[in-house]
A protein has these predicted regions:
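N-terminal amphipathic alpha-helix/helix-capping segment at the start of soluble metabolic enzymes
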Residues: 1-11, 124-138, 193-194, 200-201
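Conserved N-terminal beta1-alpha1 strand-loop-helix module at the mouth
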Residues: 1-60, 66-67, 162-163
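Structural preference for beta-strand elements that scaffold enzyme active sites
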Residues: 5-9, 30-31, 57-61, 82-83, ...
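Conserved anion-binding
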Residues: 71, 81-161, 175
Length: 227
């Protein structure tokens, strides 16, 4: 993100860290996304997933539920996650509150206290507070755009300080709009393209999750660099 370079990730629902290690060891992927919204897990599971990714210089993104997102996101960051993907957002106001929850409580910052876990391990036994601030600031904040209201509020959401990326969720969007995936495929494509356009106009990177690589060029031509 800092160097405007493309990224490629893959998704996991298994807590078996060996599966994460297999994916990361291919060197094909820049990040592994663990779907904590769907799969059961413990905090040691998240630590092991992050460790397995780190073995091969791979980042880890954790997707969290809406209801308990503050707690789960804070714990995921403490476990070593490089990014958090927040599901089921609706308004810019709640996005701001969500970003504040994982931003260190420095003057003018958020409400996140010192996460004394893997995040704070730098080999010295004592990390400067400014280092904690930088580490939490560097966590990639990603927002799912999968509700009709979120799409309507997209311009304002993209203007929330700290929002790095947005991701379209076609299945949830179709459900929320009262659509069907097959009958309203063109409508969903139109919303997706418009999401990409609005995000890029605001300097926020769209991330597109694909089941197949056949559409990569199409989205690349729209300005997407993260898959």
């Amino acid at each position: 993100l800092d160097n405007n370079l493309p990224t490629l990730g893959t998704r996991m629902e298994s807590t078996w860290a060996y599966m994460t290690e297999l994916a990361a060891s291919t060197k094909y992927f820049d990040y592994i996304e663990y779907e904590a919204e769907y799969a059961p897990y413990t905090e040691p599971d998240l630590e092991n997933i992050c460790r397995a990714s780190e073995l091969y210089g791979c980042a880890t993104v954790i997707k969290v539920d809406r209801q308990n997102r503050y707690y789960n996101a804070q714990r995921a960051i403490a476990c070593g996650a490089s990014g958090i993907l927040f599901a089921d957002m609706y308004t810019a106001e709640e996005v701001k509150e969500t970003i504040d929850a994982i931003t260190t409580s420095y003057p003018g910052g958020g409400i996140f206290g010192r996460p004394n876990r893997r995040l704070g391990m730098n080999g010295t036994g004592r990390m400067r507070m400014s280092d904690y601030r930088k580490m939490t600031d560097d966590v990639v904040k990603m927002i799912m755009i999968e509700k009709v209201d979120a799409f309507k509020n997209l311009d304002a959401i993209c203007k929330v300080p700290g929002v790095d990326m947005v991701v379209f969720g076609p299945f949830d969007y179709a459900t929320n709009a009262g659509w069907e995936m097959d009958k309203n495929a063109k409508d969903l494509d139109e919303v997706h393209r418009e999401m990409i356009r609005i995000a890029l106009e605001n300097g926020v990177q769209p991330c597109v999750q694909l089941d197949y690589n056949t559409n990569v060029q199409y989205f690349y031509d729209l300005g997407v660099r993260h898959f």
